[in-house]
């Protein structure tokens, strides 16, 4: 199951946990209030997992691929890591399922504070359209993840500031309703 906590403001290596000196954990309920959903599946069975098939059908995730992020397998590795770690949003939900390895998604809370979400093998996360976020590997420097999409994939990031983007405006309205 994913773990989450408020981050420190250190400029130290982004792959470190960055917990506050006084650790402040974030519950799954707190993540849910931000529109972030997570669950755990059996990553060893992803190719034949009926639960994953059900999730894909119920959510109309018709397109998927697998991405491996490691210096030996990803072209332009360092450049890609910088792009993934740039704060941005998407027009559609971002769904990721960790098949191997681990990494961090960072999301902003209602007060614009960073929350770090640790994901490892078996964890699936859905980040809502319009949420500011970023991704980085952890100190293991490796992740293999399934990316799921409704329809054709769109990876266009809108770097912050993108507050006038319709997806962001809808997300801010969602936050106001859950406050």
Curated annotation (Swiss-Prot):
Binding residue positions for Ni(2+): 88, 90, 94, 133
Keyword annotations of the record: Amino-acid biosynthesis, Cell membrane, Cytoplasm, Dioxygenase, Iron, Membrane, Metal-binding, Methionine biosynthesis, Nickel, Nucleus, Oxidoreductase
Record EC number: 1.13.11.54, 1.13.11.53
Top EC group: oxidoreductase
Domain of life, source organism: Eukaryota
Subcellular localization: Cytoplasm; Nucleus; Cell membrane
Named cofactor requirement(s): Fe(2+); Ni(2+)
Binding site for Fe(2+): 88, 90, 94, 133
Protein's pathway: Amino-acid biosynthesis; L-methionine biosynthesis via salvage pathway; L-methionine from S-methyl-5-thio-alpha-D-ribose 1-phosphate: step 5/6
Record Pfam families: ARD (PF03079)
Known catalytic reactions: 1,2-dihydroxy-5-(methylsulfanyl)pent-1-en-3-one + O2 = 4-methylsulfanyl-2-oxobutanoate + formate + 2 H(+); 1,2-dihydroxy-5-(methylsulfanyl)pent-1-en-3-one + O2 = 3-(methylsulfanyl)propanoate + CO + formate + 2 H(+)
Major location category of this protein: cytoplasm
UniProt cofactor note: Binds either 1 Fe or Ni cation per monomer. Iron-binding promotes an acireductone dioxygenase reaction producing 2-keto-4-methylthiobutyrate, while nickel-binding promotes an acireductone dioxygenase reaction producing 3-(methylsulfanyl)propanoate.
Gene Ontology BP annotations: L-methionine salvage from methylthioadenosine; methionine metabolic process
One Gene Ontology CC term in the entry: plasma membrane
Family: Belongs to the acireductone dioxygenase (ARD) family.
Subunit structure: Monomer. Interacts with MMP14.
PANTHER family, A to Z: ACIREDUCTONE DIOXYGENASE
Stated role: Catalyzes 2 different reactions between oxygen and the acireductone 1,2-dihydroxy-3-keto-5-methylthiopentene (DHK-MTPene) depending upon the metal bound in the active site. Fe-containing acireductone dioxygenase (Fe-ARD) produces formate and 2-keto-4-methylthiobutyrate (KMTB), the alpha-ketoacid precursor of methionine in the methionine recycle pathway. Ni-containing acireductone dioxygenase (Ni-ARD) produces methylthiopropionate, carbon monoxide and formate, and does not lie on the methionine recycle pathway.
Protein name as it appears in the record: Acireductone dioxygenase
Organism lineage: Eukaryota, Metazoa, Chordata, Craniata, Vertebrata
């Amino acid at each position: 199951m994913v773990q989450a906590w408020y981050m420190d403001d250190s400029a130290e290596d982004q792959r470190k946990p960055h917990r506050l000196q006084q650790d402040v954990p974030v519950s799954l309920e707190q993540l849910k209030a931000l529109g972030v959903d997570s669950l755990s599946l059996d990553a060893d069975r992803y190719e034949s997992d009926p639960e994953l098939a059900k999730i894909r059908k119920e959510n109309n995730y018709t397109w998927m691929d697998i991405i491996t992020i490691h210096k030996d397998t990803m072209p332009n590795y360092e450049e890609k890591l910088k792009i993934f770690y740039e704060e941005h949003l998407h027009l559609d939900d971002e769904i990721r399922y960790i098949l191997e390895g681990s990494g961090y998604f960072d999301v902003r809370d209602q007060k614009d504070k960073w929350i770090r979400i640790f994901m490892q093998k078996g964890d699936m996360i859905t980040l809502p359209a319009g949420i500011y976020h970023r991704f980085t590997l952890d100190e293991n420097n490796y992740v293999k993840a399934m990316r799921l999409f409704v329809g054709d994939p769109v990876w266009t990031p809108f770097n912050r500031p993108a507050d006038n983007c319709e997806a962001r405006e809808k997300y801010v309205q969602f936050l106001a309703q859950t406050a």
